[in-house]
């Protein structure tokens, strides 16, 4: 039985609420909380049972025939989320907003979050030592605007990229950007290349009205960069229901003060992973990374793939290292924090 053939008046009250919710999230798998399980129905059940190797069953919902259904235990959510995201799906998490034991009638449920490739934050799923950016790109026909956000740290960056597709692709690959937000008019051939060759998830969105928390643009004056950054922030807030209260001021990246390394150079020099096994362990990053925190590890990686060529910045880093070498008590205190 297909969902499009079902009339709301014919189904049970619970299924009626499910169908109303599902109609707002077409093209997204809906995990619908029922007791200790997240249930999927109709086409979502068919897809999930196949992709996750779940048993497909049926449910009586007031109709003459049973509707397709499958489910997962709520405590195993992250395991199944990771598998679906890796396969390129978006998942809407619909939770019970009331205690079923104390509620009379239908329990109120709401979609509290939509999870996609660029919005995974659970330590059980993401590698906290690596970037996990979601980005937006605008094509100005002479230059690209690129903005990218890390939901774990709340950091947001924006920059211009020269009008060269290979340079743009290299930067996206080097930054390990998982998901890209673009407008419908964006170059479809370039998007296909990113999706098929580099497993980048593509989402379409058009709202680039300046983000409501305009104070995040305190250091940004360029209208093109503000609009492009607003595109990804509005998408996260409005479409994916993400809480961005921890988002920091947007940082402008001046690409002219960094040595430009393309993806092939980083790959062949084994700067962040080995050629043969794609492992971090025996790469340059793996040998150098003695950091104590995941944030420190991500910072070190950014230094390796984008070496500074600014003399003042290089000397400042050297001075900081020398200070820690000279003041071992300070170093010990910092380590213990």
Tell me what each language-model feature is.
Residues 1-298, 303-305, 311-329:
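Basic, polar low-complexity surface loops/patches
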């Amino acid at each position: 039985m297909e969902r499009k053939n079902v009339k709301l008046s014919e189904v049970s009250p619970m299924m009626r609420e499910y169908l109303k919710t599902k109609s707002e999230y077409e093209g997204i798998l809906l995990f619908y909380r029922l007791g200790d399980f997240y249930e999927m129905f109709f086409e979502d059940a068919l897809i999930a049972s196949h992709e996750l190797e779940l048993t497909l069953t049926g449910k009586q919902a007031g109709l003459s025939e049973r509707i397709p259904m499958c489910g997962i235990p709520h405590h195993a959510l992250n395991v199944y989320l990771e598998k679906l995201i890796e396969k390129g799906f978006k998942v809407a998490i619909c939770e019970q907003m009331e205690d079923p034991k104390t509620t009379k009638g239908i329990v109120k449920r709401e979609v509290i979050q939509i999870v996609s490739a660029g919005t995974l934050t659970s330590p059980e799923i993401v590698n906290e030592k690596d970037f996990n950016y979601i980005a937006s790109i605008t094509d100005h026909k002479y230059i690209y605007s690129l903005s990218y956000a890390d939901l774990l740290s709340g950091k947001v960056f924006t920059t211009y990229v020269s009008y060269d597709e290979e340079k743009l692709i290299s930067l996206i690959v080097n930054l390990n950007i998982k998901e890209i937000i673009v407008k419908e008019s964006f170059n479809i051939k370039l998007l296909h290349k990113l999706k098929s060759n580099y497993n980048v998830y593509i989402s379409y969105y058009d709202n680039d009205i300046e983000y409501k928390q305009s104070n995040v643009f305190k250091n940004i004056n360029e209208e093109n960069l503000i609009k492009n950054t607003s595109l990804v922030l509005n998408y996260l807030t409005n479409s994916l229901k993400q809480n961005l209260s921890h988002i920091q001021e947007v940082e402008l990246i001046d690409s002219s003060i960094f040595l430009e390394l393309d993806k092939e150079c980083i790959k062949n020099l084994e700067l962040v992973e080995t050629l043969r096994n794609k492992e971090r362990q025996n790469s340059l990053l793996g040998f150098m990374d003695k950091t104590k925190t995941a944030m420190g590890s991500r910072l070190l990686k950014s230094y390796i793939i984008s070496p500074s060529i600014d003399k003042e910045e290089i000397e400042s880093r050297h001075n900081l290292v020398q200070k820690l070498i000279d003041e071992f008590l300070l170093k010990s205190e910092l380590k213990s924090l």
